Design a protein with these regions (language model features):
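Sec-dependent, cleavable N-terminal signal peptides
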Residues: 1-22
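GGW-centered surface loops in extracellular recognition modules
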Residues: 22-48
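Structural signature of tandem-repeat unit edges
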Residues: 33-36, 50-74, 83-96, 106-119, ...
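Short coil/turn motif common to extracellular beta-sandwich-like domains
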Residues: 35, 242-251, 255, 323-332
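Consensus positions within tandem repeat domains that build extended binding/scaffold surfaces
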Residues: 77-78, 98-101, 121-124, 143-146, ...
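Short glycine/proline-centered coil/turn motifs in the loop regions
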Residues: 206, 253-257, 335-337
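Pro/Thr/Ser/Gly-rich low-complexity, intrinsically disordered linker/stalk tracts
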Residues: 232-255, 300-308
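C-terminal outer-membrane/trafficking sorting elements
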Residues: 259-273, 281-296, 303-382
């Protein structure tokens, strides 16, 4: 009996230790979903009245809390429901976005979905004011009511992996003008009221063979709703305009009712149909390529270079940060807002990394660390 009671005690303690924790970081709330993972969460009810989500959100890939780094792998159900967010850029570390995550956020006009998103969930962007939306490759299903009642929705860009659009998918989207669908065969769209009452929608598909397949489909072949066209070459010239958004980010001006593939060097980092895409300001600078696309054909790339000079330089010893260790924590003071803070242990392992919002307190285990604030290194012993 004592052994059995001990078992239940250990199990109960284990459950307590693994209980999800919600915390705030950089203006967003997160809930732990695993030992090193979090989901963006809705503003807690007791704080929602005075501190709702509003404005632009560039969600980071990683956040730091209570001595540990957490990877952002999801957006929770209803996280931005009825919020005042205007633009949201979701990081590629997120693979799932919950039901109603952005539903009825009526100020939301721009969204960048992550490259590794599994599916477009139920009511994902219902009731928002998004104008153009690109869905990344790999997504198979557009969920129930995902874009229902989006009055400003003009252009949808769907990947070659699209297999199904569920009921009410585009119900009441009366300004939907064009759908670019890279799927070679018509996605199943047999649910109720997916396109009911809509008309004058141009559907652009990969080629003439795909046009024939879509035309033979009971839904996509409805000439009172759709006109089918094969994809053509994309020809658009871009200025490569880039502007400083704030101390942390530069942004590319996009638009034109198309999608854009964004490369950092040779690495694809985004597919978006938003008006803007945000990239971090770093001391090293970076080279980007912007490629307009309709999901089937790409235009020529435009090269954009973010020079290291975009980063504030230290010009006076008084601008150098103060970094020291005390009572198990690293303290950083000074003119550091927007600087990238990186901490390595004595073996070169990364322990902490994020752009600072000002003074920083980092709690770590006992040991020797190298703290890099921008380009300024300091050795600290805890």
């Amino acid at each position: 009996m004592k052994v059995r009671n001990l078992f239940f005690t250990v199990a109960a303690l284990s459950a307590i230790c693994t209980q999800a924790v919600t915390f705030e970081c950089g203006g967003l709330y997160y809930t732990t979903t695993g030992a090193n993972t979090v989901a963006v969460a809705r503003v807690p009810a007791e704080k929602a009245t005075n501190n709702p989500y509003k404005g632009v959100y560039i969600i980071p890939e990683q956040v730091y809390y209570d001595g540990a780094n957490y990877q952002v792998t999801a957006i929770a159900d209803s996280a931005f429901f009825q919020s005042k967010a205007t633009e949201v850029q979701v990081p590629n570390t997120a693979t799932t976005i919950g039901e109603c995550a952005f539903a009825y956020a009526t100020d939301l006009a721009n969204i960048t979905l992550p490259l590794h998103l599994k599916d477009v969930s139920k009511m994902l962007l219902a009731g928002t004011n998004v104008v153009n939306v690109a869905v990344p490759e790999g997504v198979k299903t557009i969920g129930w009511g995902a874009f229902q009642s989006c009055p400003m929705l003009h252009t949808m860009l769907l990947p070659s992996t699209t297999k199904r659009i569920d009921a009410y998918g585009y119900n009441n989207c009366h300004n939907l003008f064009e759908i670019y669908c890279a799927a070679p065969t018509a996605p199943e769209a047999s649910g109720w009221a997916i396109f009911i009452g809509l008309s004058g929608i141009d559907v652009i598909v990969p080629d003439d063979d795909a046009v024939a397949k879509y035309a033979a489909n009971a839904v996509w072949g409805d000439e009172s709703t759709f006109t089918l066209y094969p994809s053509e070459e994309v020809s658009i010239s871009m200025t490569g305009e880039v502007e400083k958004y704030n101390e942390h980010y530069m942004r590319f001006a996009l638009g034109n009712n198309l999608a854009y593939k964004i490369y950092k060097g040779d690495e694809l980092i985004a597919l978006t149909a938003a008006d803007f895409y945000y990239v971090p300001i770093t001391a090293e600078g970076a080279e980007y390529y912007i490629v307009p696309t309709n999901m089937m054909n790409d235009a020529e790339a435009t090269k954009v270079v973010i020079a290291p000079s975009a980063v504030k330089n230290v010009t006076d010893d008084r601008d150098l940060p103060t970094v020291y260790g005390r009572d198990g924590s690293i303290y950083i003071h000074g003119n550091t807002y927007g600087e990238m803070v990186t901490v390595f242990d004595m073996y070169g392992r990364l322990c902490f990394r994020r752009a600072t919002n000002g003074d920083e307190v980092i709690t770590l285990d006992r040991g020797i660390y190298v703290v890099l604030v921008g380009n300024h290194p300091t050795k600290v012993r805890l």
